[in-house]
Structures are given as C-alpha cells and as structure tokens.
C-alpha cells in the first residue's frame, strides 16, 4: 500500500478500524500524518498474530479460590488520619480483614500525582506510575513527628469533611513533612532506595521541585504549560535550577523513600495477617501528558494522547489526556521500560490489575489538534509486552489481572487466558442474550469476579437507580434515555432476584420495595463468590452499605470524583452486622484458609 496509509500501516498505525457494532471507521489522512510524524523515522513494525507466545505465562499459583476487599484508600476514615486514608490505615485494615479470612486488599492506583496541584486527584491520570503519592503517607508514623507540627483546628476540619480536601490535605502534610525533614537534618533518600530507583527517581524529584516553582510563578504544575526553556529536563535552565535547589530535590526523593517504606510495612502487615496474596495494586494505562513520566522521556510519545473511539455511550469518543509509551521504543527494547514499570509495582504487590489490558496489543491514539472521533488504533509488540509482563510477574510471584472491558478485540481474551492473565468479570455485565444474569458456573476460572468497580454504582446505588438519576442530572443522558433506563431497572432487579433463586440463594419474592434487605445483599455477594473465578473481590463501599459512586465517568467538576469519603470509620464499618453478613456469605463459598 502506497501513500500515508501505507506508511502508517508499516508503523502499526491502523488506517481504519472496526468499532463497536461492526462499524468500519476510516481514519482521516491528517490524523495518520500527525501520528506518523510523532512516531518518527524507524523500522516497520513486524507482523504479529493476536496470540500469546508459549514462553509468556504469568505467575498463577495453585490453591483455593480466594477473596478480598477492594478499597479506595483515600476514602478511609480513622480517628488518627488527616482527612485522607493513609498507609497506616491500610496496615490496620489488613489486620482486620486478614483475621476474617481475606487473602488480598485491592487498591486504587497509588501512583505519584501533582503535588503542586493536588486538586488533580484522579488516580488514573498520574504524573508518574513508577512512584507513589506522598499524600498517602502516615505522617505521624515517621520518626521524629511532633503533634505540635499540625494545626489541630484545621486537622479536625479535614477529618470531619465528607469529601477529601486534597489541597487542604496536601498543605497540612507537606508542611509537617518539611518540618520533619528539617528536624532530621534534611536527609536524602536512602542509598538502597536510590540505587533501586535509578535515574528515574532523580528525574521525578527534579520534576516535583520545578513543578512547585512553576506553579508558584503562575505557569501551572504540568510541564506543557511552562516556559519553553523549562520544558527540556536536560536543558541549561533546568540544570541551573537543579544545582541551586539540590536540597529541595533531595526532599522529594526522601518523600518517595518514606512512601515506599510505609507501603512495604502495609505489605508485611498483610503477610502477618495470613493473607496469601496481600496487596493488589492497580496500574493506570498511562500518565498525564504533562507529568513527570512524559517530561523529556524518550520512551513516551510526544504530542499524542490515549483515548477511546466513539461508542454507544460516548458518540464523540473519549480523550483521556494520557501519554502513551512509544510502540517503536517498546519493540526496540523488548518492552524493557514496560517491564521495569511492572517490576517496580510488583515489588510491593501480590497481585496487580492492568487498567485497559487491551493496551498490551493496541491503544487508541489521538494526535494534537484532533478530536477523539478522528483518532485510531496503534499496535504494540504484543509478544514483547507479554514476555516483559510475565518476567516481572514470575520474578515477584505476582498474579496479574487484566481489565478487559469495553471494545475488546476478538481473540484478546484467549490471549489473556494463554498468558495466565485473569479476566475481569463484573456481575452487572455478565448477562445472557435475554438480559438475564448468567449463572455462577458460567464464569471462567481464570478471572476475578466482582459486583462492580470504581466506575460503576455501588450495589445500593444500582438497586435504587441512583446512577441513572446522576447521569440525567449532569446531562450525560437525555430525558428520554433516563426514563427508559428507569423503567427498565425494576426488570433488571427482578432478573437478578430470579438468578439468586435459581442458584438456591433466595426464597423471597421477586418484587422488593425500597432498599434491598441485608440478606439479599449478602445473597448477591454469595452468588459472585460461588463462581469458579480464581479471585473474588467485594467493594468496601458495598460492605459499608454506601449508595454513592466514587467516580462518575465523563464528568469533571460537576461531580466530586475521587473525593467521597466513607461515612463510618474502618472500625465502625468492619464491626457492623451488615459487614459480617456479607463476609459470612462469601466465606460460605470460599472458606479458603479457614
């Protein structure tokens, strides 16, 4: 094939693609030209099949079906935290859940965010996936802490808030952390941590220091808004800054070292509590296009963003504003940067979830100046990506879960199964052709099963139709669609109750007015626990009988995404009858280690 379409195809860029419903989308030449320019000169992408190589199998130990609890760490309340859940809360939760038989705690991405702009709080839009968010530090657990370092009136306000006040939390924690650092003699990160983290740690700490300087000067926390001379981390301006602010950069390295130490203690707390898997960490599909991970990094495509094509829910497609890894760089290196990323995360994890796992094969890319409706897919070296992933998984004995929702290419789930990557199966989506809920036995064994995720309503929210009301309120669906969905929801509830009855888990009526009774909620969780899926996760929000979503996709400031806190403390929630009823129901199907 000649012309721009042929050159694009040589690089793995698709001149056309099949969308949901089988529609063929032809990509504008202008998009192909911009993507070809962004990819740069290089060898043609080698042809490859959608298949798992036989030498790329992730760690998947034999053993009983396990269960655990999915937690949004920032949501946790306790008498001692600072208005946001922290690593010490995680230790305490591990002791409680491990004692009840849980084998893992699933967490939202803990990636490093923008400390100079803490209101940018989506954990799926991080500054850098290699490092951690210091706002999760339990400051009071760092040696040398003195309660006099904090403003108690401000602390009580943060602790009592219904929503996480990220700017307030960041101000309180960074002030105290600087005081601790000063009192301790302004230490750097430990030599061992610096050696393990390499030059990436230095670059990230430099970014955080420059970001604070730029934000204070009104240029914003992200590098794409900085003056031109500051956009090159290897330029003279940045070099002069690094020389003049060496202590400041050491402070940011020290923060990462402290976060790594506390996460390691949480991992050890899981082991002490008897958990077979321990921490289950989430890996975002990319990094913010203006974050430290893309600041002058040769393995990241510049001027290109990850998104999603048009579908039934988003007619114009989606722009996630995330920078992708370069397919050419992955092919040239055997996907070494991806492997290093995964190895770094897996060092503290017994399991990881890869967000948008289809990115191992292809990502939907959008060049600058183009809307998502004009984007297209680009292929990655699947064999190399899978081998790098499997190597990290086996080196660290870490189970891998792939989020395989949305537009999944035919054959991709078979690739996951062949590579020992667990599928991600959600009760709300596991339906038959008539809209009924499939029986537990129809779920695959190589899977993690759950009721819902952070992008979906809680069970109480779904039952009450709160998700429909919220989407209508914020204009995500029109009045006609809202009415149709509201009229359909009672039928969906009855279908679920019938599935429970068919499974021998419910002997009550089909029509249940008002909120679902606790025994029905327990029965639904037992239904999911009965599946042959290797792992089963229950959301802490469901255990707490919360009806609010933590994230409402396609909203920004309209809804407080990633900010709702649990209404009760960890001790109050885990001590409730509703919590115990659900845990008992799960353990009836998955007794595990007793």
Model-inferred region functions:
Residues 1-75, 80-101:
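Mature N-terminal, pre-catalytic/accessory segment of carbohydrate-active enzymes
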Residues 22-26, 108-116:
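Hydrophobic alpha-helical membrane-insertion signals
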Residues 58-63, 70, 116-260, 286-535, ...:
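Alpha-amylase-like alpha-glycosidases and glucanotransferases acting on alpha-linked glucans and related
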Residues 62, 89-106, 264, 268-278:
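Short, solvent-exposed loop/edge-beta patches enriched in aromatic
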Residues 89-113, 347-351, 528-530:
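Catalytic domains of carbohydrate-active enzymes, especially glycoside hydrolases
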Residues 102-109, 270, 278-284, 345-360:
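Short acidic catalytic loops
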Residues 252-286:
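Conserved, well-ordered alpha-helix/loop/beta-strand core segments that scaffold catalytic motifs
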Residues 545-594:
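Structured C-terminal cap/extension of enzyme domains
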């Amino acid at each position: 094939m000649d012309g721009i379409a042929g050159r694009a195809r040589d690089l793995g860029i698709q001149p056309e693609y099949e969308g949901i419903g089988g529609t063929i989308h032809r990509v504008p030449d202008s998009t192909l030209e911009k993507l070809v320019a962004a990819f740069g000169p290089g060898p043609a992408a080698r042809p490859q099949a959608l298949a798992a190589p036989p030498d790329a199998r992730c760690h998947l130990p034999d053993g009983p079906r396990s269960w655990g609890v999915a937690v949004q760490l920032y949501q946790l309340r306790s008498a001692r935290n600072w208005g946001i859940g922290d690593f010490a809360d995680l230790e305490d939760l591990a002791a409680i859940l491990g004692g009840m038989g849980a084998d893992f705690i699933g967490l939202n991405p803990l990636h490093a965010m923008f400390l100079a702009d803490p209101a940018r709080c989506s954990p799926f839009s991080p500054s850098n996936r290699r490092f951690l968010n210091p706002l999760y530090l339990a400051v009071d657990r760092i040696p040398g802490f003195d309660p006099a370092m904090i403003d108690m009136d401000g602390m009580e306000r943060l602790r009592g808030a219904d929503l996480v006040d990220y700017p307030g939390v960041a101000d309180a924690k960074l002030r105290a952390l600087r005081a601790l650092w000063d009192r301790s003699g302004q230490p750097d990160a430990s030599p061992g941590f610096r050696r393990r983290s390499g030059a990436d740690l230095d670059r990230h700490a430099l970014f955080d220091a420059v970001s604070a300087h730029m934000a204070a000067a009104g240029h914003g926390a992200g590098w794409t808004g900085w003056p031109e001379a500051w956009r090159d981390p290897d330029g003279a301006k940045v070099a002069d800054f690094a020389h003049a602010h060496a202590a400041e950069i050491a402070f940011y390295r020290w923060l990462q070292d402290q976060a790594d130490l506390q996460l390691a203690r949480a991992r050890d707390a899981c082991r002490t509590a008897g958990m077979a898997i321990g921490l289950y960490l989430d890996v975002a599909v990319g990094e913010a296009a203006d974050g430290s991970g893309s600041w002058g990094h040769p393995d990241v495509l510049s001027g290109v963003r990850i998104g999603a094509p048009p579908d039934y829910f988003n007619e114009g497609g989606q722009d996630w504003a995330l920078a992708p890894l370069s397919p050419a760089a992955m092919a040239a290196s055997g996907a070494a940067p991806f492997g290093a990323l995964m190895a770094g995360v897996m060092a503290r994890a017994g399991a990881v979830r890869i967000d948008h796992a289809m990115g191992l094969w292809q990502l939907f890319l959008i060049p600058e100046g183009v809307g998502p409706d004009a984007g297209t897919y680009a292929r990655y070296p699947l064999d190399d990506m899978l081998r790098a992933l499997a190597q990290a998984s086996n080196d660290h004995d870490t189970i891998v879960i792939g989020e395989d929702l949305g537009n999944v290419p035919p054959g991709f789930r078979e690739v996951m199964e062949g590579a020992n990557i667990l599928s991600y199966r959600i009760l709300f989506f596991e339906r038959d052709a008539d809209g009924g809920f499939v029986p537990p036995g129809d779920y695959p064994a190589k899977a993690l099963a759950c009721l819902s995720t952070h992008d979906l309503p809680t069970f109480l929210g779904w039952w009450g139709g709160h998700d429909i009301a919220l989407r209508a309120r914020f204009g995500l669906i029109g009045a006609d669609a809202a009415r149709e969905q509201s009229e359909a929801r009672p039928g969906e509830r009855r279908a679920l109750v019938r599935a429970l009855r068919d499974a021998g888990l419910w002997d009550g009526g089909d029509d249940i007015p008002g909120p679902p009774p606790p025994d029905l909620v327990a029965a639904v969780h037992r239904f999911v626990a009965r599946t042959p899926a290797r792992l089963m996760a229950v959301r802490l929000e469901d255990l707490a009988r919360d009806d609010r979503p933590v994230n409402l996709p396609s909203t920004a400031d309209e809804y407080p995404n990633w900010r709702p806190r649990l209404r009760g403390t960890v001790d109050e929630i885990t001590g409730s009858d509703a919590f115990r009823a659900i845990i008992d129901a799960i353990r009836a199907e998955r007794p595990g280690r007793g």
